[in-house]
């Protein structure tokens, strides 16, 4: 954005001219880094802190941001405002220093709300599918020449970034319910993909509280705004009478305003028809597998149709959709070293899904697209509380694969909970008599323990939200081959 455009943007809110230096605590998170990237491109001085470098921090360094890989009081010196991730505790030395210096401290969603304030905001919320749906909406609007700004919780692979500053009037953003901070947003259009019990510590363990929070989020829409909601979801169907705004429903259900019909999956692509009110049927080829992605596409099409975007632009965007990072992310197909006289190839897929519903959707997509493959899953449970709260659901879902290897629970800062650990979960699954899970106590042993279970006609799903994505990439780098001690030392 040039100086004239920046001046025009800042002149909308004259007080924003006082803001020069914005500091982010926890800047390496995808959501935080995305907002920082948009603000850097708007011309603000950006600094931030995190514990370790990652691709997000590298992208920001490339844009001229100052990044500290520590948390120290002096990092916030001269900041006009400090933006804090929900993962950061109140006693963080930078937060304490900001309060002492009377520097405003705001949450990530509050800054996102400021970005959205004078744009046509489209917010995508829901327990599952937010990131992919955000990328689909962004891709359609970009294909239509509308040059949107987008802020996503995952890498938009076609753009190579989590966020991008556009010159159009639209801002398309993932809305995060995990800490209820999406209540700061005031979009013109809101998508809600589904509502399930997750992040229940935020909602005092009360599902009714979670449902009411989604209603409050939708009530942030102006009376002339629109809620786009998946009517297949029983909770959404229950809540529809309470929305109090114009609504468009979508789903496989016969009463959906935008209805998915005749779904068929061939390899990584979905093929289906969308039936829309007062519109010609749309025959879609979607470059993303699974019925869940057909629903995500239906939500994106509902929004784009309401905006008047041409069907041809919609179809081009969906057929060429490149997906998002760590969402059924195909990392390669590798020849296998002969093991027990077997040889062949194995496909490697990395997926972020860490809730039983998400894991189930990924397994179903793999089975539908590659029905003859031996399905091997390397799974890392995420958080002890989630493992405890959804223990039986995890045990049921994980029995659907042919072979299961399980890493220890990724704690995400939580203390261990007795009975909510990977060893207990493996024992429960084994007791159901369908598969015999393998506990992997050390991530360094993954390739070694994986090799003997491969048949030469395999699809390996690396599944979870912790540091397992790094393990997936390392498996791709070594092409699934166990390393000798000499090779590991050389690496």
Curated annotation (Swiss-Prot):
Subcellular location as annotated: Cytoplasm
Enzyme Commission number(s) of this protein: 6.3.2.8
Entry's Gene Ontology BP terms: cell division; cell wall organization; peptidoglycan biosynthetic process; regulation of cell shape
Binding site for ATP: 126-132
Pathway: Cell wall biogenesis; peptidoglycan biosynthesis
GO terms of molecular function: ATP binding; UDP-N-acetylmuramate-L-alanine ligase activity
Reactions this protein catalyses: UDP-N-acetyl-alpha-D-muramate + L-alanine + ATP = UDP-N-acetyl-alpha-D-muramoyl-L-alanine + ADP + phosphate + H(+)
Xref: InterPro entries: Mur-like_cat_sf, Mur_ligase_C, Mur_ligase_C_dom_sf, Mur_ligase_cen, Mur_ligase_N, MurCDEF_pg_biosynth, UDP-N-AcMur_Ala_ligase_MurC
Record GO cellular component, one term: cytoplasm
Cell wall biogenesis/degradation keyword on record: yes
Keywords: ATP-binding, Cell cycle, Cell division, Cell shape, Cell wall biogenesis/degradation, Cytoplasm, Ligase, Nucleotide-binding, Peptidoglycan synthesis
Record-stated family: Belongs to the MurCDEF family.
Function: Cell wall formation.
Name this protein carries in UniProt: UDP-N-acetylmuramate--L-alanine ligase
Provenance organism: Shigella flexneri serotype 5b (strain 8401)
Gene: murC
